[in-house]
């Protein structure tokens, strides 16, 4: 134990184990997805902020979701691309812990916002006359603040739990970025408190959110099926399609990644890493596409922006 340290000066990121020679080529699709995520989510934030007709709870939640996706993808992708293209494998102990916190906390905040959006759909469909009173813009902002505090408080202990561990042997992480489970596996001392708290936090945040989202949609489906006409039922379901797509894009990779981390020890490490990279990029890429395609105001505004840009280019070409 005398040779053990409670911190490493640095950790070494492997990237994709066994495919190090192909890192350069893996960087291009990742950069493309990251660029789409940045562009799409920035557009959503800009349109919701500048279009007064979108200053309603559902779209304010969407703006929050886009901001979270920007932060979540940006917390990892620059380092991943530096690793893949410039072989920048080193990450300091404190930077690793900070990255770990942001990944877990932002995921928890996003989960809370998705729950709030499900509640918005429930009130809008099951209690439409009370929607404006129950969910006004002030309440929406307060919910956003609660989501921020909830995600931060639940996952702030993870870096502190890592700091109490001793690392005696390897400082090599078989991943592209730092997550609690992978850093914990390098520790020499007892990690049971880390395992128990990590699992408890996930169940109390994501587990509870999934349960209440499922309950919301059970009540929504029951209410919609009681509507008299087919067109009314289709219209009511149509208002939920975008949110359902976003929920699936977030929770399906998250659940799959959690199962692989805890029960997939026999799987090739490549599976762990690729699933982790997909989990961080899939929601930020898909969310603005889903809402852009399904929301007329956003779709119209985006098309108008491109039309104005094209008209300016044509005028500039004509003047020359």
UniProtKB/Swiss-Prot annotation:
Transmembrane intervals: 25-45, 54-74, 99-119, 139-159, 196-216, 237-257, 273-293
Compartments, as annotated in UniProt: Cell membrane; Early endosome membrane
Topology Extracellular: residue spans: 1-24, 75-98, 160-195, 258-272
GO cellular component, one term: early endosome membrane
Listed GO biological process terms: adenylate cyclase-activating G protein-coupled receptor signaling pathway; cell migration; cellular response to fatty acid; melanocyte differentiation; melanocyte proliferation; positive regulation of blood pressure; positive regulation of renin secretion into blood stream; steroid hormone receptor signaling pathway
Molecular function in Gene Ontology: G protein-coupled receptor activity; nuclear steroid receptor activity; olfactory receptor activity; signaling receptor activity
Membrane topology of the entry: Multi-pass membrane protein
Record's function text: Olfactory receptor. The activity of this receptor is probably mediated by G-proteins which induce elevation of intracellular Ca(2+), cAMP and activation of phosphorylation of the protein kinases PKA and MAPK3/MAPK1. Activation of OR51E2 may affect melanocyte proliferation, differentiation, and melanogenesis and may increase proliferation and migration of primary retinal pigment epithelial (RPE) cells. Activated by the short chain fatty acids (SCFA), acetate and propionate. In response to SCFA, may positively regulate renin secretion and increase blood pressure.
SUPFAM superfamilies linked: Family A G protein-coupled receptor-like (SSF81321)
Record keywords, A-Z: Cell membrane, Disulfide bond, Endosome, G-protein coupled receptor, Glycoprotein, Membrane, Olfaction, Receptor, Sensory transduction, Transducer, Transmembrane, Transmembrane helix
Species name: Rattus norvegicus
Pfam annotation, one family: 7tm_4
Annotated protein name in UniProt: Olfactory receptor 51E2
Gene that encodes it: Or51e2
Main location group: membrane
UniProt record similarity statement: Belongs to the G-protein coupled receptor 1 family.
Segments on the Cytoplasmic face: 46-53, 120-138, 217-236, 294-320
Disulfide cross-links: 96-178
Distribution of this protein across tissues and organs: Expressed in brain and liver. Expressed only in some areas of the brain and in the olfactory epithelium.
Glycosylation sites: 5
